[in-house]
Amino acid sequence: MNRIKLLAFLVALLTTGMAYAWPGMPMPKLHVEGRWLVDEDGNHVNLHGFGQTYSPWFNEMGSKWNNYNVQECLKYNKDILDGVMDRAGWKATYIRMHMDPYWSNTPGVWTSGENDISAFDMRRFQKYLKEVFIPMAEYAISKGLYVVMRPPGVCPEKIAVGDDYHAYLKRVWGYVAQQKALTENPYVMFELANEPVQIKGTDGNYGSGTDACNKALTQFFQEIVDIMRQCGCENILWVPGSGYQSQYAGFAKYPIRGKNIGYAVHVYPGWYGSDAIEPSHELGGSYGGGYSSFASGWANQIEPCAAIAPMLVTEMDWLPKKYESSWGKSITGKMLGAGFGANFKLLADRTGNVGWMLFTGPELLAQFDGQPGSEGNYTKFNDPEGCMWSGYHWFAEYAGFELPEIQSVDLYLSPRSESVPSECLIQTGSITGAALIADRGLGFDFNVQGDIDVEISNPEILEWDNGVLNARGIGEADCTISYNVNGKEESKTIHFTSTPFPIKNGYFNPSIWADGSFDEATGEFSTGQWGFAGWKFGSGLDLSDYNYLIAEIEAPQTNGLSFRVFDVDNYWTDCYIEEFDKSTRAVIDLKNMKLKDGRKLDPSHLYIIGFWSHGGQKFKLKSVFPANDRNAEAGVEDIYITDDNVVDVYNMQGVCLRRGVAADEAAYGLPNGLYIIGGKKVMIKN
């Protein structure tokens, strides 16, 4: 019996100092201590804010000022800050300022975009740093905001240690690091670049997320950090990841050295496996993965880095597509259920050291009036499915301001349903979240604090870790969750069945790549054109105890169907392929999965398993399961094994019914039907 007692999720607002200030109030000085951003008294701090860009186009598409008019730019943007902080009353604690290349590029010189530095003029940057960016930073601080300044423009598609863009960043930050108006201001921080995509790895290949690329990325930014420190700049520095600021696992192995280092993250719908109504331009994405898919991606990329340093989300927003007023297109949704925003907050709060912001235009934030809407009459400002309505109240919660009273609190599991079920199917190698969720009558969720006590009957199958149940093995386990909120004690017991390949909605994804279809009732699925359907395992699936992985379809096909396995959590990496050809069965030898380059796949951590086809044809999936006997699958047969043999028992949907039982007792009490016992098909007839 595994028994664990801990506080549920360590909700950020109740465990950290908020560093919330108002105009004229002295702001705490911050520094990095271990994985935390802390104030002078050692209180943990998470910042929450918004962004502002200083160019005519981003200031309401050129309708407010132009022609390098410094005074009009300052007047407009200061008024926007007044609107956000004073008139609308956002409880924000930081602002991300873009030192837009509008000011530093030579006027009239054509560029291909913000990633083109060919028109950069250092003298113009120096001039407008003093005339525009420093005055705006000082004004924001006077409003009670910490300031994060980012360099002009965005990274080109490919960067490399020692290339022109690297030299450009060194030049920009080398100058900034000598400006005492900034370096002697404890409320100013710097984000070293915007959205690196690919970097030339130490192996000479461009990419992102590989060990060679991770090592090169650290070297790239370490050299910039070292230059700034040599100039006497001790400000907090926020380092971006690659993949448009979505990849951070590499920093856990190759961290940036020095003090006052954190990592700047971007989070948009569709990223990290989150739900997107419309795929993001940068990383795509789809809708339907809900909490579990998002949590798996978050665990892979954010949590390893958050274990060593603070994280700050410097771009994120979401609204339903119909409003056309956000970068990200999704909904707030439900914590532990479908949607983006609520699940993001749950994950950020659970991680504990993640600050975040809304990248929605500040001119919109300034128009927010706090008036609730009604069904059928919502606007982008008060729709509970948008980031402004929920974000405004979540910021107030973080800052400790009074909110409507809690109407109800209950325990929920993912995938979320109306109540906690007594029986729960969980995919081996995946996770199920658990949270205490409150309703304040505002149309969206709040996660709350409460004592949680967890007891698990079989920790080899199921493991509890900081609000998450991890399915470690194939089998069954009972989990009893007891909790106390405001003196109310509740206890719920759930029987979990962990199986790797449930042919069920919410587990089998027909659209891992391209839009496919799936009918749970019949088991029929189709892929999109050159698409992929199957299962993803965020924590990795361990099949090292088995010799084979077998997939069966109802009838032969003629559409290029193949069975594929990935041991890297990236669909665009090489995978092992087994063709169906004219057979109804594809059998993968788990001990001998070799790629064309000779690399052997590791069955102890498999992340994506499923089916590729040309698209346009339906296939009826019978079963997918691991086994130790390849030949036994040729047909239904009797089994003759010694009494002391130990076997596992599966139904034909791949659900493990019994694990590690004596062979002579494996079939005892089973209803009539077809089973997999010890890797062989067995027909039970009583």
Question: Model-flagged regions — what are they?
Answer:
Residues 70-154, 166-169, 222-231, 333-351:
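Aromatic-lined substrate-binding rim segments of carbohydrate-active enzymes
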Residues 27-30, 54, 58-76, 163-189, ...:
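Extracellular glycoside hydrolase catalytic/binding regions
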Residues 633-686:
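C-terminal outer-membrane/trafficking sorting elements
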Residues 406-501:
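Extracytoplasmic soluble-region selector
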Residues 21-96, 107-119:
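N-terminal carbohydrate-binding accessory modules
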Residues 8-16:
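Bacterial N-terminal signal peptides
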Residues 525-599, 613-627:
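Extracellular ligand-binding interfaces
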Residues 499-520:
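Extracellular carbohydrate-recognition regions
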